[in-house]
Structures are given as C-alpha cells and as structure tokens.
C-alpha cells in the first residue's frame, strides 16, 4: 500500500470518528420527536409518515424515521449512546450509497485515482463539515446528485434514465433541491468536454425522464396521500424565502458573508474547491479558453441560487457547495495530474487543504472529545430535571404542544395536533394570506377546542407573531405547573450549561 493511500485512509478514519462522536444539533430533537409521533400514529407504513406533519420532504422523513426505528431496536433512551448509534446507522446507509456512486463512475473520468481512493476522498469531502450539516437533507441531497452525475456520465440510456430518477428524488428531500440540476448539466459538459449542442442533445432523455417521474410520482402521492401535496404547498408560507419576502439587496450581502464564514470556516472542503477553481480559471483564461471559464462559474452558481432563495443562510445550506467542489476537484485532477513532470500545483492545494483541515479538526469537530465528561455529566443532570421526570409519568394521553419541538421530544405523549410543532400558527401573522386557508382555520379551531389535562408552551417562540386568542385561552383555562429550561445554543441541544428560555408545562384548571 502506498503512503498516499495510508494517509488518505488515516484522514478518512479521523473524519468518520469525529463525525460519529460530535454532538447532535437541536434538529435531531425534532427528528426523534417526529419518529416518536409516527410510532403513536393509528396509521401504518407510509400513511403514518404522511399523517404526522414535519416540514422536511417525504423522502427525507422516511430516511430519518427509518434510522430512528433501527436505532430503537438497540437502544431506546435518548442518551449519548443513542445519538452515536443513530449517526452510525445513518452513516452506514450514506456510505452504502457512496459505494454505489464510486462503482458507477466511468473509469475514463477517474483515471489515476482508483475506486478505493475515490471512495475515501469523497468520504472526506462529504463529512469534513460543520456538525450542523450532519445528516441534514442537504447532506443527503448532495450525495444523491453526485450519484446522478456519476450515472449521467455513462453513455448508456438506462444509466441516463436512472440518473434522472435519482436526481428527481431530491425534490422529496427538499423541494428546491432540483435547482442543483444546473450544476449537474454544466459540470457534465466540463467533464465530458462537450459542446453546448451535444450536451443539449444528450440531456433530452434525462430531461424527459425527470418530467415524467416527477409528474407520475406527484400524481400517485396526490391520489393516495393528498395531504402530502397540501403540506408541500403550505410549506412555502412557513419559510421566509426570497420569493415570499421579496428581493432586497441585503440578501447579496448576507450571501457573501455566509459564503466566507459558513463555507471557509465551517464547511472546509469548499475552501479546497475555491482554490482549485481559481487555479483552473486563471489557467483557462491564459489559454483563451473562456468557454471553460464560463461553464466553471455556472457550475458554482446554482447552489448559490438555492441559498439566496432560501433567504436563511444557515450553515447547512452552504453544504451544497460541496457538490461543485467535487466536480472542480475532478477537473483539477485531470488538468493538473501529479504524473506530469514539473506539475506541482496539486501538491500545493493538497498541502493547503491538509493544513487547513488540521486546523479545522483541532478547533471545530473534536471539541466534543475534550469535554466528553462534561457532556455526559450535563446530560445526566438534565434528565433529573423536574419537567422531564413529570414527562415520564404523564401517561399516553394526547397533549397540545405549543413549542418548537422540545415538548414532543421530552414527553411520551401523542400530539393533539398532527403538527407537533405548530408552524401553521407560529409563523403566521394576522395579516398573512395563509390565515384564509383551510389548514390555518382547522389548526386554529382545533387548538381553541383543546380541553386536555396538560399543554406545553414556549411563550417567546409561539407568541412571536400573535395568537392572542390562544394566549387568553391558556390564561383562563390553565395554570403554570412546571418549567423546563431551554439550552442557550440552538445548535447544541444537549450541552445545557446556561439557560436563556423556558418551556412551560401548564395544567388545566378544574372548575
């Protein structure tokens, strides 16, 4: 085994170890709460997954529900071990899909790399990211479109068809995800050295299959699970996208600031991708190959369009830039092979990357290793809190959860509403057009009709946009029963050493 293979495996092993032992974020709280609510559902199979609402796409809900279901076969309490097993199972599925991807990449486009090196290199690039991106929809989405690209690079028609199906499936991870199709198209043009006419001719079967698959799948979902289509349409109201809020120039400023911080500091592979892209851009400009330069820029544009349209600029949105990074590095390997005598830029880039990664590894990912004992201690202390102890004795009755998901995570009760965190009420101001929809009216009416024994309330969160009538109902019919502290860091659910908010448990006043 060559030294570079040993080094590559060593870095990959460190990345995987860091991934598995890094703290879960508060999004996992929602994922696990969702899995519990599905298990309480009176429906079976896919109907149960659809019946319980969550903002993410249907395919992504199926992925993390399956992950949680398998994890519960081994351990069923939300401990450090549960988080580790959950991420281990998720990563096993992720790497299985990555193995398929590596196998279908045509040999002529990975010449000089080899499948084993390609697997480890891609594993490093996909996992060397901020822990807020771990197992998010964007992380799965990037792997899906990399697999679609690998299939698309094959000339066989059946590969084109499967590539289109895989690519189309990203719609059910997050509905804007198919925007990455632009990166796939222009990236394939660069890799295959195609003319525009040839590329358009070749993508026709892919495009037709994409339209047919999405149309057919949406029809079937509408036919058998119409509520899912309603949820997809309603989701646009809950998110402050650029389409909802309207264009403003400050969005560009936020995009650039996020690109610098969330890409270079937290999603480390993007730094390597940008360095390689700048080198290729300068090289092609010197050779008057401006077509290549334009295609390279377009390859990076579509993930940025996704980010700016989302109008949130979360760190996991910038994870999408790993996709053009992979394409750029593949091009860089072809243009700057180490086998060419005197060609050393790859050494420079790899050295820069390794130095930067060493810094990132010591300052970002493994901080959990340094405070593991504090982490365990904090979790055990948190489990003893009065509110959680109460939750274990609440019984199996339905509860109204008026919080951001913490209540459904802590208490072992079925949600009174199918929305175990009620975005249809919390995200909607009184003047919002959504208040005229059937969804809003039904959720509001059912909430006002609640007569259960207990309810949870995260007041600062729930009353942010109004809901005065619900506030009056609570003040009149319920009394404060217990308070559960909310952690300071929104990206770190379990590391609770400071409190800045409260989840309130209310009990019905008996008249």
Where are these regions (language model features)?
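Membrane-interface transmembrane helices that cradle and orient dolichyl/undecaprenyl
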Residues: 107-112, 138-140, 145-162, 265, ...
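Membrane-interface alpha helices of multi-pass inner-membrane proteins
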Residues: 160-175, 181-186, 300-309
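Short acidic/glycine- and proline-prone juxtamembrane loop motifs at membrane-interface regions
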Residues: 130-141, 314
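Extracytoplasmic
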Residues: 56, 176-177, 222, 226-227, ...
């Amino acid at each position: 085994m060559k030294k570079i293979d040993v080094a590559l495996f060593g870095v990959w092993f460190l990345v995987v170890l860091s991934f598995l032992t890094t703290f879960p974020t508060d999004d996992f709280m929602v994922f696990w709460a969702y899995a519990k609510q599905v298990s309480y559902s009176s429906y079976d199979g896919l109907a149960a997954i659809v019946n319980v609402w969550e903002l993410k796409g249907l395919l992504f809900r199926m992925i993390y529900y399956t992950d949680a279901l398998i994890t519960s076969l081994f351990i069923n309490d939300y401990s450090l071990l549960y988080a580790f097993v959950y991420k281990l199972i998720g990563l096993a599925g992720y790497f299985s899909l990555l193995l398929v991807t590596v196998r279908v990449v045509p040999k002529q486009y990975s010449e000089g790399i080899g499948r084993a090196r390609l697997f480890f290199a891609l594993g490093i690039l996909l996992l060397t990211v901020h822990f807020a991106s771990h197992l998010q929809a964007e992380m799965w989405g990037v792997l899906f479109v990399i697999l679609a690209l690998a299939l698309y690079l094959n000339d066989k028609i059946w590969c084109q068809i499967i590539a289109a199906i895989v690519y189309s499936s990203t719609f059910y991870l997050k509905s804007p995800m198919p925007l990455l199709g632009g990166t796939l198209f222009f990236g394939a043009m660069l890799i295959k050295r195609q003319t525009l006419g040839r590329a358009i001719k070749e993508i026709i079967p892919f495009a037709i299959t994409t339209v047919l698959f999405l149309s057919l799948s949406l029809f079937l979902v509408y036919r058998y699970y119409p509520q899912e289509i309603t949820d997809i349409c309603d989701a646009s109201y809950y998110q402050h996208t650029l389409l909802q809020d309207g264009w403003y120039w400050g969005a560009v400023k936020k995009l650039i600031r996020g690109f610098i911080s969330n890409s270079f500091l937290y999603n480390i592979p993007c730094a390597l991708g940008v360095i390689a892209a700048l080198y290729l851009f300068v090289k092609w400009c010197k050779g008057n190959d401006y077509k290549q330069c334009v295609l390279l820029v377009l390859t990076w544009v579509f993930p940025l369009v996704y980010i700016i349209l989302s109008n949130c600029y979360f760190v996991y949105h910038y994870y999408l830039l790993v996709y053009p990074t992979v394409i750029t590095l593949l091009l860089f390997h072809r243009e700057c092979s180490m086998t060419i005598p005197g060609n050393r830029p790859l050494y420079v880039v790899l050295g820069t990357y390794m130095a930067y990664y060493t810094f990132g590894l010591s300052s970002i990912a493994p901080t959990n290793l340094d405070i593991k004992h504090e982490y365990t201690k904090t979790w055990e202390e948190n489990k003893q809190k009065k509110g959680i102890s109460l939750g274990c004795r609440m019984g199996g009755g339905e509860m109204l959860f008026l919080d951001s998901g913490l209540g459904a995570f802590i208490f072992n009760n079925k949600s009174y509403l199918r929305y175990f965190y009620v975005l249809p009420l919390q995200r909607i101001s009184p003047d919002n057009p959504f208040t005229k929809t059937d969804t809003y009216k039904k959720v509001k009416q059912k909430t006002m009709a609640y007569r259960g024994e207990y309810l949870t309330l995260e007041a600062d969160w729930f009353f942010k946009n109004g809901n005065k009538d619900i506030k009056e109902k609570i003040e009149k019919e319920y009394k404060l029963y217990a308070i559960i502290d909310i952690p300071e860091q929104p990206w770190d659910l379990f590391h609770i050493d400071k409190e800045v908010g409260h989840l309130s448990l209310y009990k019905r006043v008996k008249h």
